[in-house]
Amino acid sequence: MNVAPLNKSPVRTLTYSAICLALALVLPFLTGQIPQIGSALCPMHLPVLLCGFLCGPWWAAAVGFVAPLLRSAIFTMPPMPAAIAMAFELCTYGLVSGLLRHKSHKSLGWLYGSLIIAMVAGRLVWGVAQVVILGLSDSAFSWAAFWAGAIANAVPGIIVQLILIPLLVLALRKAKLAD
């Protein structure tokens, strides 16, 4: 019987992906009572970025795309069409962090570099999605709106991501729960 080690097992990958999806659905409840805090801390972003480093690009992209749409369908937050733009943003976070995860083994600098590249790529995709979605409804999406939504209002969440994601990835690797 050929059994893959736990850290290479597809069962582990599926389990971690399911946990990350569940966290993406539940974490916003911690900040959801005050919408301004919730949108500033970006709680759905954390499990998707983590999923990329743990499970790889395809699983994390799927978790990232499904999470905001499923949460919108079940809990009506984020509201449509914001959930659609978030789906593309989080899908990009998962995809890019997953594609760069093997580089992140080299050093802490590579881990941060991979994380920052994923965060920038996701925010750019969010901006493009907003332009397309709002363009379809004859609304405008300005550079000021992009700056406010992707950067200025998200600074607390960006800081939390830059602190927590590397700590969690390194802790899981040290515990041999991630490769």
Give the predicted meaning of each segment.
Residues 33-38, 42-43, 76-84, 104-179:
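Membrane-embedded alpha-helical hairpins and interfacial helices in multi-pass inner-membrane proteins
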Residues 58, 66, 124:
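Gly/Ser/Thr-rich beta-alpha loop segments that engage phosphate groups in nucleotides
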Residues 2-6, 12-26, 63, 83-131, ...:
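Short helix-perturbing small/polar motifs within transmembrane alpha-helices
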Residues 26-42, 66-100:
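Interfacial aromatic-anchored transmembrane helix boundaries in multi-pass membrane proteins
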Residues 62-66, 164:
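Short hydrophobic alpha-helical segments that form membrane-spanning helices or hydrophobic packing faces
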Residues 45, 49, 86-94, 158, ...:
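Alpha-helical transmembrane segments of multi-pass membrane proteins
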Residues 1-54, 58-62:
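Hydrophobic transmembrane alpha-helices
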